[in-house]
């Protein structure tokens, strides 16, 4: 989950949020009690997970494009890219070389079109764009058209008025896993 803290889960004592499925996984599997997140925000952390590099090495230390290198600031900012550089190998690229089918479904927020998931080793990209969120999570996901196309959800076929984006993306993820299981091909799902 994006920006999920360890204390947000009921298996760690949180009474506010009920997380039965995650609790079951924690009980039956492994708990990461000493894990380290590369950044407190989404974009740098996602880039670090995909490349294995610290956000500072990638020059990706923020998630807000509007916070990048604006000339009227009194403090000098470090160079900060608004895209995941193609020169860095990603987990998906390495898995692709090993014969995996790679699907990215959901939030990307790692740069413009030339740096979308297909450019980083993913066979499928559903929803991954420059923007961190669609204008709305209710179908048709693009609201009133106020924002540019990159704020929409690409490669997701039309749905119905009652469709909620999280449910649609979950359905696509499940369908992708079922398809890959039928062909007995190893796969990596980045959701």
Question: PLM features: what roles do these ranges have?
Answer:
Residues 1-5, 24-25, 34, 49-51, ...:
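Beta-strand elements within well-structured catalytic alpha/beta cores of enzymes
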Residues 1-30, 97:
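Active-site-proximal N-terminal segment of extracellular/periplasmic enzymes that hydrolyze or transfer
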Residues 8, 26-29, 34, 39, ...:
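Sec/Tat-exported extracytoplasmic proteins
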Residues 11-15, 31-53, 61-67, 104-115, ...:
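Short, solvent-exposed turn/loop segments enriched in Gly/Ser/Thr/Pro and often Arg
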Residues 19-20, 49, 98, 107, ...:
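Polar, surface-exposed loop/tail segments
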Residues 22, 45, 91-92:
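Short, hydrophobic alpha-helical packing/hinge segments within bilobed ligand-binding/sensory domains
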Residues 60-100, 110-191:
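Formylglycine-dependent
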């Amino acid at each position: 989950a994006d920006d999920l803290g360890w204390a947000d889960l009921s298996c760690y004592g949180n009474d506010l949020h009920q997380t039965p499925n995650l609790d079951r996984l924690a009980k039956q599997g492994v708990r990461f009690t000493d894990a380290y997140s590369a950044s407190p925000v989404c974009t740098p952390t996602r880039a670090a997970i995909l490349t294995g590099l610290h956000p500072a090495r990638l020059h990706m230390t923020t998630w807000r494009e509007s916070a990048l290198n604006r000339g009227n600031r009194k403090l000098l900012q470090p160079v900060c890219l608004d895209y995941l550089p193609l020169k860095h190998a990603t987990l998906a690229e390495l898995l692709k070389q090993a014969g995996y089918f790679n699907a990215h479904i959901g939030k990307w927020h790692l740069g413009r079109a030339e740096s979308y998931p297909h450019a980083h080793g993913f066979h499928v990209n559903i929803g991954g764009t420059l923007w961190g969120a669609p204008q709305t999570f209710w179908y048709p996901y693009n609201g009133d058209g106020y924002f540019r196309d990159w704020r929409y959800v690409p490669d997701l076929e039309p749905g119905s008025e009652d469709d909620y984006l999280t449910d649609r993306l979950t359905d696509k993820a499940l369908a992708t896993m079922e398809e890959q299981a039928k062909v007995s091909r190893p796969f990596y799902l980045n959701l």
